[in-house]
Amino acid sequence: MASTFNIPCNAGTIKNFNNSQRNLGFSSNLGINFAKTRFSNCGDSGRIPSQLVVRASERRDNLTQQKTGLSIEECEAAVVAGNAPSAPPVPPTPKAPSGTPSVSPLSLGRRPRRNRTSPVFRAAFQETTLSPANVVYPLFIHEGEEDTPIGAMPGCYRLGWRHGLVEEVAKARDVVVNSIVVFPKPDALKSPTGDEAYNENGLVPRTIRMLKDKFPDLIIYTDVALDPYYYDGHDGIVTQHGVIMNDETVHQLCKQAVAQARAGADVVSPSDMMDGRVGAIRAALDAEGYSNVSIMSYTAKYASSFYGPFREALDSNPRFGDKKTYQMNPANYREALIETQEDESEGADILLVKPGLPYLDIIRLLRDNSDLPIAAYQVSGEYSMIKAGGVLKMIDEEKVMLESLLCLRRAGADIILTYFALQAARCLCGEKR
């Protein structure tokens, strides 16, 4: 067959057809035989005309059809005469099982299943994607040298900050997970006012400095809250009557955020749910010269029962009462808009919903009402349920894991904090390689 190319009239003169490949810029792997190149209306000038007709070579590297033995010219003549070589027959329509009723086709103007018939179609029309860039890896750290397993979270450990943590971060980076969030377990350093939270030589600042030294481009999120440092396990300072003090707690949180930023944190993440903390932290960071440090606010953090394994990991269960006076009621929907508006006005850079999968409607609500990036936290209870189901062979752990993360993305999450980050990224990279 012949192919026609439109080319500029002022192209250089062809001195030798054997050099046409170089002059015209065609690569040799195109299967074009330039010895059989036919130029139309060249005249005697030797100049390349504005229209070039090129015949394909008879060579085919991957030809699987049976050869007819005819030349290209003979094949073309046969087609013109209506004697084209026969193509494979149309495959027969699959037979229905015996007993299938005979019915007239439904009169449907649209059949959505047509766009699902092929893996190629399904991939082309996929609306939501998931990649390692969409996940943030939460990591638990402690002062010890050894990595200790967390019983309620299979596959998760309290990592020794000098060795185990570095190894885990290196594994994550191997599969393009370059964002982490660290949660400390400062065993014997709890106090009534959580002062260890802003100790610049404390576990978290030391860890940040070490990681930034080893992995300068690593994005480090930090947790801003007092519960790991407060002996009663609450996220704020508590009065003698068990009341969580808001403004006094915010004062401590500002010092904690500045200490983390000074150590090199990229994103500070207040998870305490105190009123006004985002604006106060933003002002404190800016005053200290850290205007480029982002704030990911736990905007809609619910008083959920899905946090149990996490609290075991950090030994941060409340010693009395619960956290319902500052975390949101799981029954509430519109309240999330109030928190969204407040956090946006106070200078938040990222809005987070926690937990994740049980609160897809809240993720979508924030996505539809804010232009800021939305984060979702697939919390410890969600992780442990999937792990347990996989161990008991009740579900396919890998497929459910990936589906759950894809659902969070579909609901509107730009990034997902998930303990599956490393496992999921390995699966995703394996699928694409």
UniProtKB/Swiss-Prot annotation:
An MF annotation (GO) of this entry: porphobilinogen synthase activity
Positions annotated to bind 5-aminolevulinate 1: 311, 323
Intrachain disulfide bonds: none
Record-listed E.C. numbers: 4.2.1.24
Cofactor(s), names only, from the UniProt record: Mg(2+)
Pathway linked to the protein: Porphyrin-containing compound metabolism; protoporphyrin-IX biosynthesis; coproporphyrinogen-III from 5-aminolevulinate: step 1/4
GO biological process terms on file: chlorophyll biosynthetic process; heme biosynthetic process; protoporphyrinogen IX biosynthetic process
GO cellular component: chloroplast; cytosol
Extent of the transit peptide: 1-56
Swiss-Prot/TrEMBL keywords: Allosteric enzyme, Chlorophyll biosynthesis, Chloroplast, Heme biosynthesis, Lyase, Magnesium, Metal-binding, Plastid, Porphyrin biosynthesis, Transit peptide
Binding, 5-aminolevulinate 2: 380, 419
Cellular compartment(s): Plastid, Chloroplast
Origin: domain of life: Eukaryota
PANTHER family the record matches: DELTA-AMINOLEVULINIC ACID DEHYDRATASE
Subunit structure of this chain's protein: Homooctamer.
Assigned protein family: Belongs to the ALAD family.
Official protein name in the record: Delta-aminolevulinic acid dehydratase, chloroplastic
Species in which this protein is naturally found: Spinacia oleracea (Spinach)
Chain's gene name: HEMB
